[in-house]
């Protein structure tokens, strides 16, 4: 299991009185992020924080948008009429990415995250400048180990948000394929 998800610096939900595991939709997450932005948190060096970031080249911003996703293994769908559709050609895909634009526009998502290097991203997470991050939990932990953040500021340990539900409201789970799968080669 890769442990993809959204993570928040541990002192944030405590200061705001929010249980991060109660966040189940992207809309609830955005509300949580806005409250964190309004609070005015600082990093370990006393600098202003950015609300949310990703790792290199925007990896994995789509974790913030999980509640727009259907529970399935592929980007293709078979509609009621028997037509195959591709997610990136759907209205949902457009709406989902408009949320990303709104996050950047509202100052919730670091606009540099789409072109950043992994080292720069690790620095933002490692010194607690980013209040929220997403990708694999191990990557988040590694960034804080490199900086010593947890040793000097254990209250800033990143913790899980959610997990966010699928678009139909069902809980996010590890999706398993049915029947045969794999390569014939």
Language model features with spans:
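Extracytoplasmic/secretory soluble proteins
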Residues: 1-185
């Amino acid at each position: 299991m890769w442990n993809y998800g959204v993570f928040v610096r541990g002192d944030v939900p405590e200061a705001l009185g929010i249980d991060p595991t109660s966040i189940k939709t992207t809309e609830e997450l955005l509300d949580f992020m806005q409250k964190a932005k309004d609070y005015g948190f600082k990093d370990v060096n006393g600098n202003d924080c950015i609300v949310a970031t990703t790792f290199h080249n925007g990896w994995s911003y789509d974790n913030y948008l999980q509640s727009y996703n259907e529970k399935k293994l592929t980007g293709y769908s078979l509609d009621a009429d028997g037509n195959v559709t591709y997610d990136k050609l759907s209205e949902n895909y457009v709406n989902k990415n408009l949320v990303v634009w709104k996050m950047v526009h509202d100052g919730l998502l670091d606009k540099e995250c789409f072109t950043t290097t992994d080292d720069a991203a690790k620095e933002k997470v490692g010194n607690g400048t980013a209040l929220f991050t997403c990708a694999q939990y191990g990557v988040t932990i590694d960034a804080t180990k490199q900086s010593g953040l947890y040793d000097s500021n254990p209250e800033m340990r990143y913790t899980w948000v959610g997990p966010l539900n699928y678009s139909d409201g069902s809980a996010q789970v590890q999706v398993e394929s049915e029947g045969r799968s794999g390569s014939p080669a």
